[in-house]
């Protein structure tokens, strides 16, 4: 079933009875994932600092299936409150999607990067998922089940695709994911991350200074996988659905790359030719 489909039949729904918190859930990948999770039967807490967008999304999804909380992922109190809100409103927490992220200023040289900017990117992109994982595990461990997912990046495995701060944060996030999986597996909790290539989202538009069409054209041209078109936020949502659902019941400690093979191919070698 395609991520963007308007309806999912009852027998095909993968998250019936599940409760999820999605940080950065008001727009981009987070909003696409919230919509898909609800289509598959989940109840979703949208956690974000974009209050108007969050309220609009919840109005779209409906109050029985969703709720919005203001959440700055660098503030531990906010993250703990988002998790507690999910439990208070919907009775439990099954899925934590640490999706909030920032790209930071486009610093092309270390000499142009400030310590404050570097630390801000790490605070959101690395400390945020740490806090989300910590507090999700707090309520998941007694239940002996749960799936924790974080949004990493193509930059978690290749260099030269983003700033030093962003690349560092995503490399470190993969390491944290693996270590957290090692600790939490004994409690029945799976921990994974998703690493997309460039996808047209508000974050990408701001970082690249381009519109959706230009971003998609660049990524489609650089992609190793041809004929599939441009990577969409819906594709990332579908990957998160796999990891959140019982389809991924034995998958933990993994970095699921959704990049059409871009991260494993060095096209400059030119060995494979038509």
Curated annotation (Swiss-Prot):
Disulfide bonds: none annotated. It comes from the Eukaryota. Gene3D superfamilies: NAD(P)-binding Rossmann-like Domain. Its EC number is 1.1.1.295. PROSITE patterns: ADH_SHORT (PS00061). It is an enzyme of class 1 (oxidoreductase). InterPro entries: ABA2-like, NAD(P)-bd_dom_sf, Sc_DH/Rdtase_CS, SDR_fam. It holds the Pfam family adh_short_C2. GO terms for molecular function: momilactone-A synthase activity. It catalyses: 3beta-hydroxy-9beta-pimara-7,15-dien-19,6beta-olide + NAD(+) = momilactone A + NADH + H(+); 3beta-hydroxy-9beta-pimara-7,15-dien-19,6beta-olide + NADP(+) = momilactone A + NADPH + H(+). Induction: By chitin oligosaccharide elicitor and UV irradiation. Keywords: NAD, NADP, Oxidoreductase. The phytoalexins momilactones A and B are diterpenoid secondary metabolites involved in the defense mechanism of the plant and produced in response to attack (by a pathogen, elicitor or UV irradiation). Momilactone B can also act as an allochemical (an antimicrobial and allelopathic agent), being constitutively produced in the root of the plant and secreted to the rhizosphere where it suppresses the growth of neighboring plants and soil microorganisms. Belongs to the short-chain dehydrogenases/reductases (SDR) family. NCBIfam families: PRK07231.1. Involved in momilactone phytoalexins biosynthesis. Catalyzes the last step of momilactone A biosynthesis. This is Momilactone A synthase.
